[in-house]
Amino acid sequence: MPGKVAKIGTFSDWVGMFDDWRKEIGVNHDEIANFKFDTLYGAIETEEIQFGAFKGRRKWDNLRQVPTQQMRDALINLIVYQGDTEFASVEQQRHLFESAPTDWDRKAITRVMIEEMRHGWQMCALLVEHFGYSGKVEAQKMLERRAFENKRLLGAFNVDVDNWMDFFTYTDFVDRDGKFQLQMLKYSAFAPLGRSMSYMLREEAFHMGTGNDGLRRIVEAGVIPAWLIQKYLNKWISSSYDLFGTDHSSSAHWAYVWGVKGRYDEPKNDKAPDLDDLNDYNRNLYHDEVAGLIERFNNSLKAGEPKLYAPHVKFNRAIGKWAGQKCHAQTGEPLDHRAYEEHVKDYMPSAEDKKLLLDIINNEKKWIAEKTGARDPLSTIGEVRKSAINL
């Protein structure tokens, strides 16, 4: 598809491109090919704008009601970035079906991919329906970029997810960043975007649960050493910190002023926002949630194993004020160049670490505890959708 000239006139045209995209990247298994993708809208808590300069006014139902072109541009940018991550994650994980540790896990990753595709579908439906020619162009480009060609918009979504330690850590923590982003968009003054979030959030909960439970099963099995698990936590959580955006972001500042993207805890937070520190505020909420989840894993560690932890927000950062800074993974303390080079070997996965991990996964049948008492993920995929407004 990349390089083709194809103009989208209607959403049906886009659906044809979506079908081609699935086939081209190799994720058109029967369960996926036979799934009925659709656009789902749920209820929003209030019809009034909840924050920013337009607080108290009625939320906007269409683009004509959005006051300025700058605000319309901000909305399309938010939707494009969100949609791009959804399709990227499918591309990142596309080779994992055959290596699933259990049949339940194979069905779980199938469901995760179906729902990520549906989230991308939802964002492209918004673009095509509400944003005219520009929206159609962006919806088309969404299916032309490729994670495995390093073309996705955010760096973490161009990294291969090619083993099940990566997958479980990714779905627990990168998808958890996704939860934060979706929740912030749920409060949007642009009502169609806010209504899109209800079912995306419910579906995202399954993805995070799959990752969190997968890591719990790995820790309980006690075959993969804790120091190796920690390296994968460091890899994906530090990438997730970057996904919250730069410090002192003018984009986040104006998105809040215009009412199109709130704080994660917006309805419960009655304090005046620091408009120049919004991304860091939400990032710190994420860190605290992640740290609590990891502490639970420690309850299942074998005696003598080192405790797991959330890496410091200064570690391994690629954007913001800590980008390129050489800081300790656990304490955040600054290190000199030579010390940091050695430190990274001990705290981030190396080629040798990956080889060890794959040796364990391929040769130790009990590297992960059995999944017990769980329903078939594909049999329950429609349950969160029963009350949706299906358009």
Q: Residues of each region from the PLM?
A:
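Alpha-helical scaffold segments that form or flank carboxylate-/histidine-based iron centers
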Residues: G3-V5, R72-Q82, P101-H119, F167, ...
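Active-site-proximal alpha-helical scaffolds that flank and shape metal-associated catalytic sites
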Residues: G132-G209, I229-V260
